[in-house]
Amino acid sequence: MSCCGGNCGCGAGCKCVGCGGCKMYPDLSFSGETTTTETLVLGLAPAMNSQFEASGETFVAENDACKCGSDCKCNPCTCK
């Protein structure tokens, strides 16, 4: 029988935790609470004319590639 009906959450170090499934931020789980965030913009800068070159680099957050198998063991780290 699988833990959480096969919907295990992957935490740090590709270890399965909780029942939240594979999330973008694997160490965070749903707690049923809501949070309100406010953003205040204090000023604006003038537009700048610049050219940027694409560097071709790709950044991946650490431990966000876990995939949990049906027995709540990470089965390879491939969930993104």
Curated annotation (Swiss-Prot):
InterPro entries with a match to the protein in the record: Metalthion_15p
Superkingdom field: Eukaryota
Protein's UniProt keywords contain Metal-binding: yes
Gene Ontology molecular-function annotations: metal ion binding
This protein's UniProt keywords: Metal-binding, Metal-thiolate cluster
PANTHER family cross-referenced by the UniProt entry: METALLOTHIONEIN-LIKE PROTEIN 2A (PTHR33543), METALLOTHIONEIN-LIKE PROTEIN 2B (PTHR33543:SF33)
Purpose: Metallothioneins have a high content of cysteine residues that bind various heavy metals.
Family: Belongs to the metallothionein superfamily. Type 15 family.
UniProt name for this protein: Metallothionein-like protein type 2, MT2-28
